[in-house]
Structure formats: C-alpha cells, structure tokens
Amino acid sequence: MFKSGFVSIVGRPNVGKSTLMNNVVGEKIAIMSDKPQTTRNTIQAVYTDEEMQIVFLDTPGIHKPKNKLGEFMVKAATEAFKNVDLILFVVDDSKKIGPGDRKIIEDLRSVKTPIILVVNKIDQLDQKDELFDIIKMYDREGIFKEIVPISALKGKNTDTLIKVIQNYLEEGPKYFPDYMITDQPERVLIAELIREKVLHYLNDEIPHGVAVEIEKMKARNDKEIVDVSAVIYCERDSHKGIIIGKNGRKLKGIGKSARQDIELLLGSQINLQLWVKVKENWRNLQNYINNFGYNDK
C-alpha cells in the first residue's frame, strides 16, 4: 500500500526547520543561516521512496511581526497549520519553554491535526539526562502524539522521523513525479541562494533588510554557460556600502560563494553579475514584497 500526505514543519525562528527539510530530501532547497527569520516563504519539498511520498511545507519562523513582510511571514506560517495531514513542531535543545515556543504551543492546542514534537540539535547536549528532561518538559503539555529527538545538521535519527511520519499517512497517490523535490522555480532558488550568502557574509549587520531579485537568467547558445544578473536590495545607503565592502571585496566573496552553489543546482557554468540597490523601507511596501516573491500563492 502506497502512502502519501502533506506535513507542515513549524517552529520559532532558528530552530533548524530548513536544515531538517534539506537533510530529508537530500538537496539544498531552503537556505540555511543562523540568523532568525531566514525562511520568508512557505517552501514545498518532496520526499519519495518505494512506500510513500511526503510533501513537506517548511514555514517561516513564527515571531512578532514588525513590518508588512513580517506580517506576511507569520501569516504563511500559521496558514500551514491548515489542510495538512501532520504537523511537525520543531524545537531546539533549550532547557526551558520560552515565550516563542509557548505561543506556538497555545496556538496548536486548538488544532485537530496530529502533532509530533521534533527536538532538534541533540548533538549539542552533553548528557542523556538533559534530553530526557526536555522530552518530559514538553510531554507535560499533553498535545503531542509522539516526540522524536534528532540532529538535523548531523542527520542523526532523521530516518526514524520518516518512519514515524509514515505511520500517520493514509493510502494515497503520488502528487509529484519521483524526480521532483521542490515546487520552487529555479529563479526563486537562485535568489534565495544568493541571499543565504549575503546573510553569511554580513554577520549581524543588516540581515533582515536584504532581498534579492533575479533580473536576467539566460543560457547562451551552446547552453554550457548561463548568464545570471541579480540585484541585492537593501534599505539604506550605509547598508549598500557594507554589502559591497572595501574595494568590493565583500560583494565579490558573496558572488563567488553563490556562484558555486548555483552551478551545483543547475549543473552548468554560471556567469553571475551582482548589483546592490537601495530601496528605503521596502519591507513595508506591498508592491516590493510581491515583486520579491513574498506573496500569497
């Protein structure tokens, strides 16, 4: 009997939701960063084997929004509670339930969909007793069907998580062909890969005010080289200088690192050109939010 279903991955920012999804499908389809609110859209990823197909919805981290972009991100995350077969609530190795996790738990109490708690980052725990205490702490909430400890970064116990998910799926069709692992267009994936490198190179300087738009993407006649032109948008002139760096070094580093990942994604040589432009307060301008792909589908 072949099983299939839709599984939503929810949690507060920076608990490893995207890392988990990338590990399960075996490809980088969601960008990873230690900066909160890295994921901005609900990303659909597909895991398929001989017995099942799981369609994962990786959501933005649930947080208190400060602008229109933040409002969209929270809406996308909470909408992912609906019309799915299973919810994975991902938490990290924190010893206490903080206000962010508490808010999500209270939101989940009214949800009828089965919920599995995924305790991530167990590789950072020194003692087994620490993990036991975390599991016991969350189990007292009384809303989780099962609790599965994993390390998404190390790939530890993710195979067990897949088997647990399988138990909650019903007989169903393949929604996507075997080769398909995401519904994200190539342009979106490329823009997100570039944004990942920007976040990496900027450290904590200006991560949330950055967006990337692909202006041109065209294969040359021999199709061995793909020309990609992209604009990195920021909100202040001072931010533009930080992104470019002294003598353009930081922008060159971003471009070199992004090009390597894009070449792996497309399987072609990439000629990548990057520009930096300023658009003040774009996170509160709906037309820019839409243009950057952060809109309801």
Curated annotation (Swiss-Prot):
Region feature G1, mapped onto this chain: 11-18
Record-annotated Era-type G domain positions: 3-171
Span of domain KH type-2: 194-280
A GO molecular-function descriptor: GTPase activity
Region (G2): 37-41
Keyword Phosphoprotein applies: no
GO CC, alphabetical: cytosol; plasma membrane
UniProt keyword annotations, A-Z: Cell membrane, Cytoplasm, GTP-binding, Membrane, Nucleotide-binding, Ribosome biogenesis, RNA-binding, rRNA-binding
Membrane topology, as annotated: Peripheral membrane protein
Location of the protein in the cell: Cytoplasm; Cell membrane
Source species, domain of life: Bacteria
Chain residue ranges for the region called G5: 150-152
InterPro entries: G_ERA_dom, GTP-bd, GTPase_Era-like, KH_dom-like_a/b, KH_dom_type_2, KH_sf_prok-type, P-loop_NTPase, Small_GTP-bd
Subunit structure: Monomer.
Similarity section: Belongs to the TRAFAC class TrmE-Era-EngA-EngB-Septin-like GTPase superfamily. Era GTPase family.
Function (record text): An essential GTPase that binds both GDP and GTP, with rapid nucleotide exchange. Plays a role in 16S rRNA processing and 30S ribosomal subunit biogenesis and possibly also in cell cycle regulation and energy metabolism.
Protein name stated in the entry: GTPase Era
